[in-house]
């Protein structure tokens, strides 16, 4: 199943972006990443997308480690870092979708 993960981190910092992408790649080596860009509605934040072709079990395992409290349906959900536990302290927002 093809999945897309939208990632927003809380600082425009290339080293931080690399660290977060490295963590994501460790959790899911199948991810490919779009170029990052400044997040238009959040001052000082950057965003990018990660895509992969994953099995149902891989999706379940990944969702369990990315965040502890997703909102929404299993295959279309999101989470904010200010009120949940993210896989990295600088992740502000995640949206996970099957496409």
What are these regions (language model features)?
Residues 1-25:
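Short, extreme N-terminal segment that most often corresponds to the first beta-strand
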Residues 2, 41-43:
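Short Gly/Ser/Thr- and Asp/Glu-enriched loop/turn motifs at secondary-structure junctions
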Residues 21-32, 43-99:
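Charged interaction segments
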Residues 36-38:
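N-terminal/domain-start alpha-helical segments
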């Amino acid at each position: 199943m093809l999945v897309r993960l939208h990632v927003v981190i809380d600082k425009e910092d290339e080293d931080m972006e690399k660290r977060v992408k490295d963590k994501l790649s460790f959790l899911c080596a199948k991810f490919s990443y779009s170029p990052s860009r400044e997040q238009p509605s959040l001052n000082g934040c950057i965003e990018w997308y990660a895509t992969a072709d994953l099995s149902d079990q891989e999706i379940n395992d990944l969702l369990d480690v990315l965040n502890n409290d997703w909102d929404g349906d299993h295959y279309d959900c999101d989470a904010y870092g200010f009120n949940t536990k993210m896989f990295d302290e600088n992740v502000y927002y995640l949206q996970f979708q099957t496409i």
